[in-house]
Curated annotation (Swiss-Prot):
Subcellular location: Cytoplasm
GO cellular component, one term: cytosol
UniProt gene name: glyS
Keyword Transmembrane helix: no
Alphabetical list of NCBIfam families matching this protein: glyS (TIGR00211)
Name used for this protein in its record: Glycine--tRNA ligase beta subunit
Species for this entry: Rhodospirillum centenum (strain ATCC 51521 / SW)
SUPFAM superfamilies documented for this protein: HD-domain/PDEase-like (SSF109604)
InterPro entries: DALR_anticod-bd, Gly-tRNA-synth_bsu, Gly-tRNA-synth_heterodimer
Family: Belongs to the class-II aminoacyl-tRNA synthetase family.
Enzyme class: ligase
Length: 714
């Protein structure tokens, strides 16, 4: 078995594009191998800032022979049909075809045997196609070439079983020299193709090892690159950076602030990582830590360091792409100089922002359009203020807390017009909280402003303080109601206004804080302030949307989506905490033996009723059972059990004891099983039959009073 090694060597690939490009290239090559009938065992891709390297192992040196059968026309068909068959099958005479009786007549069959060729012969076109089809978010031309690529492509290494794959990639044409004054006597001829030939050479680190390397295999390639100061494996580079940064932090008595996203990006910026530590001038340390961290991370790709108490330290980690003779002193000094300029701007904005009260800044929100159909950001802030106070009342907050909710909601968007947020949009909300503290607003008001966007995702922290919870809920519910009102709902993968995230945020805020709040009245209250909203329609659509989001949120916890459907099927289930209590109890019920068997009996009853109700054109639900026509002991026992269950079930449901309610339903298993074993529902006597169908309807209705059992799968 042979090995295919391909390296695309180029100028620096943007770090954010590398992993996706590597996976795309692996897929394009392996898909083409499979389409060509070339088997392989495994494919592995690596990326660095200057190269995409793919190795495919376990490829046969020769392609397998192919035997193909092609059915032709019936024996005795017209000559024209026979000639068409011969041409399509590559035969010269009909005697070369076989005659077979298919049971539907005798037909001609062509047996075409194609000997497998050398695999290397199929590779040039395969590699060319994979390179040309590689998608880039952005691409460019360079020089006079027609070929587009993310950055100028310098070389293509292509080896199969140690041999260079013949051919190359045409990237453009070289124009012939212009005519001389003597006419075309010196004309060199037609334009010639510019081709990057496949070869067995690459280069190491741009500065440390710029010489050409000749390789013979993937192992040789990896080893020679390492010797030339290139660590090919991205994960290894990440681990080296992480270990080096942690060690550097520990040497300073500090702790590295975890930042997986930045680690991923920095691993795509260096081929030979060298970790260095720099300092932040003390004059900048009164700027909020989030602003400093964002500036270092976004603009400079520095890792922040913290004290053991979690406070930002005046030190940072920078990762260079090579060691230096001075131990990195010049590199650190240069980075500190650049950072000083960056943070000078941040400090200027911070000082300016502190000078103006948030209430004064709030008026400038009238100049920011939230959405062309939904008014300005000031109008949105007013909606959030009114809704947050309503939510706070629902949660039972006292008068003082209600006022703090009102202030926090009123000011939560004011930092959008600050200089710091204009420079660093990532700190919106957080910056407002810092300004509020500096301007002596109550601590829980400042915290609510800082946290009103939270949670930002499934793993983000959920606010727990009641003031913050009320404002965060109002922010998200206003967003959801407003965009649903103008029919900007998520569709498929399209969710430009992050409404799925907002709904998940509402779910987490309510569930993780155990809040007893009905969503529909809140949706209705929010809809009143949105000119385009039709309250009932928006509320119903949103509740269905929340049901879908709840399924997604709980799927990771192993909760079955059909159980959520069954509880939502009751209608009006907009108290999420109560709903989840029902779901938990229902999950325990269907997992028990009695519950599973009763579910089977429910389906049997429901199926009989569906057929008979359709046939009779009536519903048997709600009709009284004639006790005098309960002829068999089993039907009398079932009727008595249903009466007892109904009497005991209502107080359990009122007390929200859903586990007790499910336990009560489980006791119906015996009478229901006995009924189906001994009683004929469709009796010849029409009155008796109707009475028994009403008894089945009681089974269905009793269970459906706890959950819509028709939606439970399995």
């Amino acid at each position: 078995m042979a090995e295919l090694l391909i390296e695309l060597f180029m100028e620096e690939i943007p770090a954010r594009m590398q992993v996706r490009a590597g996976e795309d290239f692996r897929r394009l090559v392996t898909d083409r191998l499979a389409a060509a009938g070339i088997q392989f065992q495994r494919a592995e891709v690596h990326t660095t800032p200057r190269r995409i390297a793919l190795v495919v192992e376990g490829i046969p040196a020769r392609q397998a022979d192919v035997r193909e059968e092609r059915k032709g026309p019936r024996v005795g068909s017209p000559e024209q049909a026979l000639q068409g068959f011969l041409r399509a099958a590559g035969l010269t005479d009909i005697s070369q075809a076989e005659q077979r009786d298919t049971g539907k007549g005798v037909f001609y069959f062509a047996v075409i045997e194609k000997p497998g060729g050398a695999t290397i012969d199929a590779l040039p076109a395969l590699i060319d196609g994979a390179i040309r089809d590689l998608p880039w978010p952005k691409s460019m031309r360079w020089g006079t070439n027609q070929f587009r690529w993310v950055r100028p492509l310098h070389g293509i290494l292509a080896l199969f079983d140690g041999q260079v794959v013949p051919g190359g990639l045409t990237i453009g044409t070289a124009e012939p020299p212009p005519e001389t004054s003597e006419g075309n006597a010196c004309l060199a001829g037609e334009a010639t193709a510019r081709v990057i030939r496949y070869g067995n050479e690459t280069k190491g680190h741009r500065f440390l090892s710029p010489d050409t390397l000749t390789v013979t295999s993937f192992e040789d390639y990896k080893a020679k690159l390492r010797g030339a100061h290139v660590i090919l494996d991205r994960e290894e580079r990440k681990q080296l950076i992480l270990a080096g940064a942690r060690a550097a932090a520990e040497a300073e008595g500090l702790v590295l602030k975890d930042d997986p996203g930045l680690l991923e990006e920095v691993a795509g910026l260096v081929e030979w990582p060298v970790v260095l530590v720099g300092g932040i001038d003390e004059q900048f340390m009164d700027v909020p830590a989030e602003v400093l961290t964002t500036s270092m991370r976004t603009h400079q790709r520095y890792f922040a360091l913290e004290t053991t108490q979690g406070k930002l330290a005046p030190r940072f980690v920078v990762v260079a792409n090579r060691p230096t003779v001075d131990g990195g002193a010049a590199v650190v000094a240069g980075n500190e100089r650049v950072l000083r300029a960056r943070l000078s701007d941040a400090k200027f904005f911070w000082d300016q922002d502190l000078a103006t009260p948030l209430e004064t800044r709030r008026q400038a929100l009238a100049d920011i359009k939230f959405h062309e159909k939904l008014g300005t950001m000031l109008e949105r802030a007013e909606r959030i203020e009114a809704l947050a106070v309503e939510i706070a009342r629902t949660l039972g907050l006292d008068t003082g807390a209600l006022e703090r909710v009102r202030i926090a909601a009123r000011l939560c968007k004011a930092d959008l017009v600050t200089g710091v947020v204009g420079e660093f949009p990532e700190v919106q909300g957080i910056l407002g909280g810092h300004v509020a503290r500096a301007q002596d607003l109550p601590a829980d008001v400042a915290d609510a402003i800082a946290d009103h966007y939270r949670p930002l995702g499934p793993s983000d922290r959920v606010p727990a303080d009641p003031v913050a919870v009320a404002v965060a809920l109002a922010d998200k519910i206003d967003t959801l109601v407003a965009f649903f009102a103008i029919d900007e709902k998520p569709t498929g993968s399209r969710d430009p206004f992050a409404l799925r995230r907002a709904a998940l945020g509402v779910i987490r805020l309510i569930v993780e804080n155990g809040l007893r709040a009905s969503l529909l009245p809140l949706f209705g209250r929010a809809a009143v302030a949105v000119p385009a909203a039709a309250g009932e329609t928006v509320g119903g659509d949103l509740l269905s949307f929340f049901a879908d989001r709840l399924k997604v949120a709980l799927k990771e916890k192993g909760v079955r989506h059909d159980l959520i459907d069954a509880v939502f099927g009751l209608g009006g289930q907009d108290d999420l905490v109560l709903l989840l209590k029902r779901v938990d109890a229902l999950a325990g019920f269907v997992a028990s033996e009695d519950g599973a068997n009763l579910l089977v009996a429910y389906r049997r009853a429901a199926n009989i009723l569906r057929i008979e109700e359709k046939k009779d054109g009536v519903s048997y639900s709600g009709g009284g059972i004639d006790a005098g026509r309960l002829e068999q002991a089993e039907e009398r026992a079932l009727a008595a059990a249903l009466d007892a269950t109904a009497a005991d079930l209502a107080p359990l449901l009122a007390a929200e004891d859903f586990t007790g309610a499910m336990r009560l339903l489980s006791a119906l298993r015996g009478p229901v099983d006995a009924f189906f074993d001994k009683v004929t529902v469709n009796a010849p006597d029409a009155v008796l039959r109707a009475n028994r169908l009403r008894l089945l309807a009681r089974i269905r209705d009793t269970l459906n009073g706890v959950a819509d059992f028709s939606r439970i799968e399995g």
